[in-house]
Amino acid sequence: MDFDEKRRILAERLRDELNLSEKVYNAIKKVPRHLFVPERYRTMAYVDTPLPIGYGQTISAPHMVAIMCELLDLREGERVLEIGTGCGYHAAVTAEIVGKRGLVVSVERIPELAEIAKRNLSALGYENVVVIVGDGSLGYEPMAPYDKIYVTASAPDIPKPLLEQLKIGGKMVIPIGETTQFLYVVERDNGVRKWSWGAVRFVPLYGKYGFRPLEE
């Protein structure tokens, strides 16, 4: 069975199990996850599990990428901030959904991973993704505000800069907690509302508003 067939089978299973919208299903079905993971893990690319990508980081399981996309209610033309680029896979899925009129700004604290993500995204023609090296807990103010924000590492609390960079009417998805983590949906309107989707497991967020500052 080739990678395309494995990807189709995974996408169909996630669609049925998670009741995915057509836009999220199509993005999962299209983005070649095997081209984002290290070569030694490519045979496992379409197993629904996280995989190591080096530097102590992982690529999220496909079901979690799909769930976060659904919770955000991503729409064509939106400007989205991603915290934690990793290998670029989640950004590619998001880019497929927001389309060429949209923009994904992704912040990665590990320069080597940022370079890997840039190469992966460029090789596949994703011109609507900008990868920045920096402290993700600070967001990226120069391109704010954002319609949607999502964080791929667990934070001690909602970082203040991310709330400030979220548009009024915008939505954020972020895991919060250390030993026990929960995935929260945060909505900014007149005030801030948040609700928990459920328990999750992510790597920790490091930075000024993370579990520890970045090393100088």
From Swiss-Prot:
**Recorded catalytic activity of this chain's protein:** [protein]-L-isoaspartate + S-adenosyl-L-methionine = [protein]-L-isoaspartate alpha-methyl ester + S-adenosyl-L-homocysteine
User: Which residues are named in the active-site annotation?
Assistant: 60
Gene Ontology CC terms, in alphabetical order: cytoplasm
The record ties this protein, via SUPFAM superfamilies, to:
S-adenosyl-L-methionine-dependent methyltransferases
Protein keywords: Cytoplasm, Methyltransferase, S-adenosyl-L-methionine, Transferase
InterPro entries to which the protein is assigned, alphabetical: PCMT, SAM-dependent_MTases_sf
Provide the protein's localization: Cytoplasm
- Which GO biological process annotations does it have? methylation; protein modification process; protein repair
The free-text function statement in the UniProt record for this protein reads: Catalyzes the methyl esterification of L-isoaspartyl residues in peptides and proteins that result from spontaneous decomposition of normal L-aspartyl and L-asparaginyl residues. It plays a role in the repair and/or degradation of damaged proteins.
Protein's name according to its UniProt entry? Protein-L-isoaspartate O-methyltransferase 1
